[in-house]
Amino acid sequence: MDLEAKEISGNIPNENALAELCRLCESADLSQIENFVGRYKNWCLSIIWPRNCWLRFTPRKDVAGYTEKMFEDMDDHYQGFVEKLCLLGTIQIPYRDVPILIGRSKRIFLHDLETDTLHFVCDNFEQFVRYGVLGTNIITCAEPVYRHGLYEGPRFESLENLMNNDVLRSPYTLNVHVKLNRKGVLGIKAMRKHYIAMLREFDELARCASLDDVGRFVSLNVGRDLRLDMPVFKSLTLGTRDSVWTGTCRLANLKEQEDLVEKVVVLGYLNDHDYESKCTRPILCIGKSGKIYYYDWIDNVLVKLGDCLLTFLRVGFARLFADYGYEKIGKISMRFGRMSTLGMSETYQSCMSLSK
């Protein structure tokens, strides 16, 4: 098969092509985005960062090292929830092609073939055009240096011209020697499995839309254990402020913290085999804003662990162990409970999908 003959194909982008793509991405019309990519196949859009990098429009079947099944798995297995993803194209770095995808939520992601990990890039395509790819070590770990004349704005070039000028290599020579880091992948898959298991455990609690709802749920389930797949604490035993042993002075300390921070509802105490008495176990609280707080009887301080219950489950005790990139995914709202905890936007039960 003559691979080089396939390097340039598709229509020539006109001056309105970028505006059209921005409009399609803003509406999250994935079928039309896919049609756009097919129409301008093997044309490249310059991006501001990293320098000299281009987004090459290409369908899934033409990305070396990938199969259709791999792209289908990214819709669900990588995030713990279902969000249909559409391939925009690839960014070429030395000897590798990095897929850039857009989700139904309008967010932009990239996939690392070596670790089989999906990373969050930015909230929408407009940000991608303005800033490029920042904050990931997959493409670069350096910060951009903005200089006059360094970047002339987004423009289209054919893959053929970029190859003739030695800017890009033939995409069919890329990803050939990239090997799966199996040890890293197994660790990430284990974290992913634990994360999804915790979503199932806390799904009922996540449906509470107010502090009153949370209080009623906890009071009806006092003593119930919710499993935490975290290195330090293994479970949360639900309990009200009255049922969790505090003592008068310690309860007063908690009220003082509420005056300084915000009103909270006690969810229960955190369990680990090292704690011999309930009296010394730290407790977990949720605030009116939906933020999750940790409170122990040594420091007597409410410490924020996450902006919402979902963030707490995803990141966990980030000070104590690596969270393997889950903080890069962004706030998940399409998969977790009827309401994505306090302070989050409404989601619908029909969007839920408990997959592997």
Swiss-Prot record:
InterPro entries, sorted: US22-like
Entry superkingdom: Viruses
Pfam families: US22 (PF02393)
Family label: Belongs to the herpesviridae US22 family.
Entry protein name: Protein U8
Naturally occurring in which organism (per UniProt): Human herpesvirus 6A (strain Uganda-1102)
Record gene name: U8
